[in-house]
Amino acid sequence: MNTMTLTPGQLSLSQLYDVWRHPVQLRLDASAIDGINASVACVNDIVAEGRTAYGINTGFGLLAQTRIADEDLQNLQRSLVLSHAAGVGDPLDDAMVRLIMVLKINSLARGFSGIRLSVIEALIALVNAGVYPLIPAKGSVGASGDLAPLAHLSLTLLGEGKARWQGEWLPAQTALKKAGLEPVALAAKEGLALLNGTQASTAFALRGLFEAQELFASAVVCGALTTEAVLGSRRPFDARIHAARGQQGQIDVARLFRHLLTDTSAIAESHHHCHKVQDPYSLRCQPQVMGACLTQLRQTKEVLLAEANAVSDNPLVFADAGEVISGGNFHAEPVAMAADNLALAIAEIGALSERRIALMMDKHMSQLPPFLVKNGGVNSGFMIAQVTAAALASENKALAHPHSVDSLPTSANQEDHVSMAPAAGRLLWEMAANTRGIIAVEWLAACQGIDLREGLTSSPLLEQARQTLREQVAHYTQDRFFAPDIECATALLAQGALQRLVPDFM
């Protein structure tokens, strides 16, 4: 099992990926403890001195002007969690819940939230024991933080709601008992600290980024395979072309194509002296289009990594000055915009792949049998597989509509502008699944096209990509039930079968 020492504010993208993919045993670095304790002491001083501070001894949202008596402060925090656990939709899977919890721990342990070390350790204990709160996927607008999802997470700490332990949904109290854990009672400020934050939005978008990286790499490999299958030129990947423009993403993608294609191959030599002057854009402009997508992936990584290590609570406790200051770090606009931009990249990766599939269907453009099968007419070959790819590409165009420009006021207009970051992040998963299906069809089609160049082979890496598929999916000599082959190729892509052929590009 993955073991990780968490130094607050220093999570790396690879650590976050590991948390998403695998259960983790988490330990808090000792350097965080003094800051955590100092912030709690500051909150206690405010309560003891009778000062009014939002979220500590007031109501919330539009009720912020309501002063709460000291004897009601614990009940205030518990009531906050219970009332805000109002999410709907399917439960998030264990991987997403685990990522949200680790992000929440990372933020709280920065020492600006006024939450006791014992509560943070209780969250860590949930992660380590594999107790995963039931968090519905929908119900947050991404400001004031991800209130509903994080309230559902926090319910389990209180022994309320449901949680999954060892694959079984149980009452939270039962799950805690089976894992050898106890519920906690929240003190002043702690319920708000748990609920306020962008951790669900950030986790949603991070999953989108992780999937987009796999899709990007797979699409580059399939684009190179298609280039060989239709006797495309290597000349558009010449480094001098891309250096002249100076777009770094484009330069790097062209380098990836040169790595995959190598200088030549038996296929390339077979048409070295052909009379074709230029390839269609879906081949020739791959570095330009995929380079723009890579730039978006890199920018998204920068924003999400900053947010993963951020303090997005409100109010914030500045213990060194003895102050609690209200602000707006809970507003997930950076995450929403990053997710929206990533959606454009995922849509374009799929759209370009679909155009290459269509190119292979056209015998005049590809110089291959119509629909990549012999005895056409009796056999329809890849005809409808390309239609499926077109349907998925079209869906993605609608899903790529930006969410960050869509705001609805909430909390009686106190919270009058929101980010919609959770929806922006969550839809990335559907887009990624669509794009993976498109790339799977291209992989099948490109390998079939190369097979039809009988006796000719591609570069070593591309032959490896073809062999990986052929170990699971046979060449098409005649029509057969097609859907299982797409499912098989899709599963291989999700396992990183093509991604591992591509050097690191992030």
Swiss-Prot record:
<feature type="cross-link" description="5-imidazolinone (Ala-Gly)">
    <location>
        <begin position="143"/>
        <end position="145"/>
    </location>
</feature>
<dbReference type="InterPro" id="IPR005921">
    <property type="entry name" value="HutH"/>
</dbReference>
<keyword id="KW-0369">Histidine metabolism</keyword>
<dbReference type="InterPro" id="IPR008948">
    <property type="entry name" value="L-Aspartase-like"/>
</dbReference>
<protein>
    <recommendedName>
        <fullName>Histidine ammonia-lyase</fullName>
        <ecNumber>4.3.1.3</ecNumber>
    </recommendedName>
</protein>
<dbReference type="GO" id="GO:0019556">
    <property type="term" value="P:L-histidine catabolic process to glutamate and formamide"/>
</dbReference>
<comment type="similarity">
    <text>Belongs to the PAL/histidase family.</text>
</comment>
<feature type="modified residue" description="2,3-didehydroalanine (Ser)">
    <location>
        <position position="144"/>
    </location>
</feature>
<keyword id="KW-0456">Lyase</keyword>
<keyword id="KW-0963">Cytoplasm</keyword>
<dbReference type="GO" id="GO:0019557">
    <property type="term" value="P:L-histidine catabolic process to glutamate and formate"/>
</dbReference>
<dbReference type="InterPro" id="IPR024083">
    <property type="entry name" value="Fumarase/histidase_N"/>
</dbReference>
<dbReference type="InterPro" id="IPR022313">
    <property type="entry name" value="Phe/His_NH3-lyase_AS"/>
</dbReference>
<dbReference type="Pfam" id="PF00221">
    <property type="entry name" value="Lyase_aromatic"/>
</dbReference>
<comment type="pathway">
    <text>Amino-acid degradation; L-histidine degradation into L-glutamate; N-formimidoyl-L-glutamate from L-histidine: step 1/3.</text>
</comment>
<dbReference type="GO" id="GO:0005737">
    <property type="term" value="C:cytoplasm"/>
</dbReference>
<dbReference type="GO" id="GO:0004397">
    <property type="term" value="F:histidine ammonia-lyase activity"/>
</dbReference>
<dbReference type="InterPro" id="IPR001106">
    <property type="entry name" value="Aromatic_Lyase"/>
</dbReference>
